From Swiss-Prot:
UniProt EC number: 2.3.1.20
Organism encoding this protein: Glycine max (Soybean)
Name of the molecule in the record: Diacylglycerol O-acyltransferase 2D
Membrane topology note: Multi-pass membrane protein
Transmembrane segments: 37-57, 58-78
Amino acid sequence: MAAEPVSDGGAAAEKLISGREEFGDSSNLFSAILAMVLWLGAIHFNIALILLAVFFLPLSKSLLVFGFLFGFMVLPINEKSRFGRRLSRFICKHACNYFPITLHVEDMKAFDPNRAYVFGYEPHSVLPIGIVALADHTGFMPLPKVKVLASSTVFYTPFLRHLWTWLGLTPATKKNFISLLASGHSCILIPGGVQEAFHMQHGTEIAFLKARRGFVRVAMVKGKPLVPVFCFGQSNVYKWWKPGGKLFLKFARAIKFTPICFWGIFGSPLPFRHPMHVVVGRPIEVDKNREPTTEEVAKIHGLFVEALQDLFERHKARAGYPNLELRIV
């Protein structure tokens, strides 16, 4: 079973792309704030509407509000919408400039536009918003077809489901994952998912990876390279609080979402303008294996975890976090 970093045979083509340098000239603060509110404000907007309906409106108007929200839960989404594509490009451009986000690719030549890759992105944080640097609408990576696998809860949330679908997100089901890889899409996922958000700690980065091997198995079955990715600074763009305990964990698992109280500037959903550095490691080539054994999956999983840890250690000082610790749980 071969599993090693791959390149095109030449010297590694290290590349640094700054969101501010790429989009700074075409951005202004108002547009950036508007983009961030559209992208990240839907959760707070839904909560505000529900609170308004429950506590302040008469029954008839409350029912109207809930009917309105339900309508947006089931309204069909046109993934090829021209408006959706334009809005997505607007959000991606201004998001990369807002923080700003810098993308550091260790070997750009190692990525073939005609191949599909499995990106294992860490950490989850409150929201894994640094992923926008890898989106196809941003255009930083040389990959024409990219999808982000996200919790299915997103796709039952009014307004959010439309926006995030247009941004390239899709439900994180095994069937979806396999189908997308087979059709030539590169897939970005956060292996730790809901449980990683539950394990978050202030001042330390947590990657819930030890028990997460399903994404490795799928990559092996389809013969797609695994790519470690780490985002520095993402955990600082929101302040947050969450309850603890086994009951809360069971609830989070049941709804496939970790309900966290989080806030940004002036208590709003607008995140703090804290620089983020998204570091993309070299792909780990994996031989196609339709029926990998548990031991074979464990071996490749170990290589991925080791590559992620190494990526973190080599870049943390450069990203401005020399004393930061990454815990694999």
